[in-house]
Amino acid sequence: MQIILLEKVANLGNLGDIVKVKDGYARNFLIPNRKARRATKEAIAEFEVRRAELEKIAAEKLAASQAVGEKLNGQAFEVTQKSGVDGRLFGSVTNGDVAELLKKAGFEVEKLQVRMPEGPLKMIGEHVVQVALHTDVVVDVTINVIGDHA
């Protein structure tokens, strides 16, 4: 399916690019999240009329993300979980838990923005987690998992 991107999408393209993607990706993710539209003649003409407005909105989002990124970059947060004597957690700390922790600290972060390269945290100690505030703004946050011996 041919689509026109309404914002920058990682690994796909920038604002205004016309790209071909699989139908399911377009119908189930890009179009419902208002990241893209079908690339019909009418949609392309309408996009060209709104291009300046969309570019201004994209620049504002990027600036806001960079401002939040400067505050968030390098910060450390603590989370307490029940653990065994060997340092393994009963359960794990997931990206949803990290997003909740950041929301309590005053940062608007969604679960999908938290990237954990090694998967959920299952051991006590300090772990570095990436937070993708924008496709161009990715910051590192340290999560210190403290064990609560059961």
Curated annotation (Swiss-Prot):
Keyword line: Ribonucleoprotein, Ribosomal protein, RNA-binding, rRNA-binding
PROSITE patterns in UniProt: RIBOSOMAL_L9
Pfam short name (any one): Ribosomal_L9_C
SUPFAM superfamilies in alphabetical order: L9 N-domain-like, Ribosomal protein L9 C-domain
Disulfide bond entries: none
Protein origin, superkingdom: Bacteria
GO cellular component: ribonucleoprotein complex; ribosome
InterPro entries hit by this protein: Ribosomal_bL9, Ribosomal_bL9/RNase_H1_N, Ribosomal_bL9_bac/chp, Ribosomal_bL9_C, Ribosomal_bL9_C_sf, Ribosomal_bL9_N, Ribosomal_bL9_N_sf
A GO MF label: rRNA binding
The UniProt record lists the keyword Ribonucleoprotein: yes
Family: Belongs to the bacterial ribosomal protein bL9 family.
Alphabetical list of NCBIfam families matching this protein: L9
Designated name of the protein: Large ribosomal subunit protein bL9
